[in-house]
Structure formats: structure tokens, C-alpha cells
């Protein structure tokens, strides 16, 4: 579906959630693994740095499809909303790339800090944030006992905080790890275990934080939200009045940064004047740079943000193929056995309400061993489709990247 050329109907808003140092106790009761088929949308952003997390995030969201008002992959029902973790996907690709001798277009050494930078917020995964924010991050490489891993590779991924565990690759084993490391918020693995799957990389991220300035439930009202196809739906719109905070309202963007409790993690809400298809990583980066703490301009604001919750199950094979980690990738730094990457998936969810935000993602890569003997004054209202990105307030590193096309849809 094409978008209206009326600027009021074609503006979207990006909400980049920059992680704040305090977590919000949200009552999340139904953040479970997505039941839908895998979303296979992937739009490569050519001419951009493929190790850049904003580039990865926009590619995974399928920016061209969003501009057309389309949902997920062509072989499944359309969804107006998507959430991905660029950090989870990039970390999975980076750890696998450390074992590759074939050409890849990402730089693992540059991606590694994006996985390890959240250690100061480490805690148990929860859907009820407390006085301080929690970012629970865990990972492992599960290896069949018959598959020898090179010591050099083992040493390399230790720097990623990725231990190697020896054990049979079974559905029960993978499911148990996912449930344990997401506090039960994701119910099981997204991989389909096959007889030739001998190595599995798993990582999990759970984020929970309270707003520094919470929205008042009594102020939440029904409000019009214009979807990508121009139709209008009614949403639960939360409001902040006389709110002093960072904003932008020029050069093709309206936006605001909403901090979590210690101001180190934040939500960046960005509403582009142009169609979604015209949003590039460069334009997005320029807008974000005006909201980070070093460059912020503040004012008294009136802010409207819809409540939303949804899940996405994402097929990452398009992304892996694009960066040189397709089935033909040579992983000879990892093991001398013939191997191929056979599955790559991510399950993600996000919940935003008056108290704060809870989000999570599980990223998994299944590697097969070949069958051989070797075996206020300014009003900013998110009343049309927007991006919601979770990251830190200083750099806006995108831990989670969401597109919200209809807040009423789960």
C-alpha cells in the first residue's frame, strides 16, 4: 500500500529507547514467544557501514516494506509492528564471524563492545523492573561432544562473554536455556532442531526500566492514530504535560528523548516528516545526534506516546547472507570439520506503558556439521507510525529497534 503524500499522514515516529540506569517495574504477564511465522523481511542498506548498528536495525526492520505500509514477509499475514535487537543480531553474527576464513562484511572487533557495554546494569531477567534498571545479557555456544573446537577460537569468543558448553543439541536443551535466561518471558527456542545441527549459538537480552518521569494513568485517553495506509485507529495515548526535556523540531524531524530513572538509558522517539522509505542510517544518525546528552536542546514539552506491546519472530538468514555468513561461509577458524550455517532466528518482544519499558530478545544460530567421517511549549505526539529504539543516552546505541504501525495490535 502506498502512503499518502499529505505530510500529516506520511510522518512516522521513531522511538529510540536509550537505556537508562534505572529499571521500571512493569506488569508484563504475556510476553511469550511469538506464535506467528518467521518474519523474513530484510532490506539491505547499500553504501552504508555494515557494522553500524543503525544500518543493521533498519535492514532487519525491512525499511522498504515499512514505507509501503506492508507488514512482515510475503508468505505470512501482515503485521503493522516489528521489534528487533540489532545488538543481539550483530553479536550473534560477530561471534560466528570470528570463526570465518571466508570474506565477511562486518567487523567483529567493532561489534564486540556493543554486546559487552551493558555489564553495569547486569541483573536477573525480570518483567517487573525495580529501583534500578536491569539489562540481563547471556550467551553460550552449545557444541556436540563429537565436534572439536579450535582453542584459538575458544579464546577469542571468551572476550565476548560467550562460554562454550559441550552437550547434545536437542530441543529440550535449547528451550531450557532460553527459559532460564529470559526469566520465562520467552518460552522456548526459535530453532527447528535437525539431525545435522551440531553447534548452536544462543544469546538473550532482557531490559526492564522505569521512566524518570512516569506517565500518569489518569491522563491516558483514547486518541486517533494514523496508520501507514492512511486509515485511523483509536489508541491508548499516554501524556506528559509541562515536561522539561530534550527535543528536536526541525530539519525533517520531530522528536523527544525520554529518560529512564538515572538518565543513562533513554527512549528516543523520532517522527520523520518524510516517508519511512526515505529514512537512511545517515539521516537517523543525524537526528539522534541532536538528542544525545552532549548535544541536547531542552524545552517545556507536551508529549503524547501510545501504549503498546507486541512480539516479532525474525528469520535472520537474509542478514547473515548479506554480511557473508551464508551456507557457503567457511568457519575453519572455529573447527576443522566441514560446517554450514543452516538457521538463524531472533524472537523479540517489547512492552511500553505508563511506568516504563520491558523488552527482550533471543537470537540463535544453528550450525550444521557436514555428513562426513569427520563429523508544553512544544507538542510532540506519536499519532502515526514510529520507530522505538532502546539504547544508551550518550551514544544511542540501539539495543532494541521497533517499528510501531498500529499500537492496538499485539
Give the residues covered by each predicted segment.
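Bacterial Sec signal peptide processing site at the extreme N-terminus
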Residues: 33-41
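N-terminal secretory signal peptides
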Residues: 1-8, 19-26
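C-terminal motif of bacterial Sec signal peptides marking the signal peptidase cleavage site
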Residues: 29-30
